[in-house]
Amino acid sequence: MPDRLAVLAQYALPKRALTTWAGKWASARLGGLTTALIRRFVARYDVNMAEAANPDMAGYASFNDFFTRALQPGARPLARADLICPVDGAISQFGRIGKDRIFQAKGHAYSTTALLGGDAAMAARFDDGHFATLYLSPRDYHRVHMPCAGELTRMVHVPGELFSVNPATACVVPGLFARNERVVCVFESAPGPGGPFALVLIGAAIVGSMATVWHGQVNPPRPGTLRQWDYAKGQVRLQQGQEMGRFLLGSTVVLLLPRGPLQFNPQWAPARPIMLGQAMAQRCAD
């Protein structure tokens, strides 16, 4: 009950104003104060700085630099698998996509069309496909990498709410991931014929911005209207394991995969911790 009340209280909070303030504060260069706050954050969330490319907490000019810290080379070896985990975090849910329906939590599902910003034709390409919802906590590495090689075809910034995306909120707020602000990145598998796949970066309260490697910072600005960018064939190609984007602080990634035989890692289960590069799934022969 306390968790539910805390989640319901989010409806009354000025989430957008708080997030704007947090974004400005996180980008500020405050010298020793920034270092002191980073040290406090690392202690509170038990962040493993030993694996960071720069383990010196005094070496980050702003909180944003710390949140988006790189890892040391070799810190996340890539498994030999058709699909690898694109992030560090925990499994929220995974499984089959129904006809325009994705499972969120017990008693809750949401529309694929709504998740993708209202594009029913694109959503239909994922009917009877597969999804994985992956939660990044504040302590996790905040960059997002490619689960397989792909060629970018479209990016959409969808305006929306800024609820928290932690597991407690996912169990209470209907259609959470299709309500929050998000950046939809649609790819074609390269080389084919794997079909389309989408990485959807879900915004959240206090997540100041999201960025991609080909565009840079996507938000802010937050104009309140849907924005779409289309990409020519061959314009943006990324290899498996290559960075594609990043969050400031932490949030959720929803991965959509097309119809076809697929076997998720048998060790996968909701709430299980995952790490970038681990085996996620194998495509199966028809």
Swiss-Prot record:
What post-translational events are described?
A: Is synthesized initially as an inactive proenzyme. Formation of the active enzyme involves a self-maturation process in which the active site pyruvoyl group is generated from an internal serine residue via an autocatalytic post-translational modification. Two non-identical subunits are generated from the proenzyme in this reaction, and the pyruvate is formed at the N-terminus of the alpha chain, which is derived from the carboxyl end of the proenzyme.
Please state the Enzyme Commission number of this protein. 4.1.1.65
One Gene Ontology BP term is: phosphatidylethanolamine biosynthetic process
- The site feature described as Cleavage (non-hydrolytic) is recorded at 250-251
Does the record's keyword annotation contain Transit peptide?
Answer: no
Top enzyme class, one word, equals lyase
The record's comment on cofactor binding reads: Binds 1 pyruvoyl group covalently per subunit.
Q: Name one Pfam family in it.
A: PS_Dcarbxylase
Q: Which family does the entry's similarity section mention? A: Belongs to the phosphatidylserine decarboxylase family. PSD-B subfamily. Prokaryotic type I sub-subfamily.
Q: Which Gene Ontology MF annotations are present?
A: phosphatidylserine decarboxylase activity
Keyword field contains Glycoprotein: no
Q: What is this protein called?
A: Phosphatidylserine decarboxylase proenzyme
According to the UniProt record, list the residues that bear Pyruvic acid (Ser). 251
Query: Which cofactor is recorded for it?
Result: pyruvate
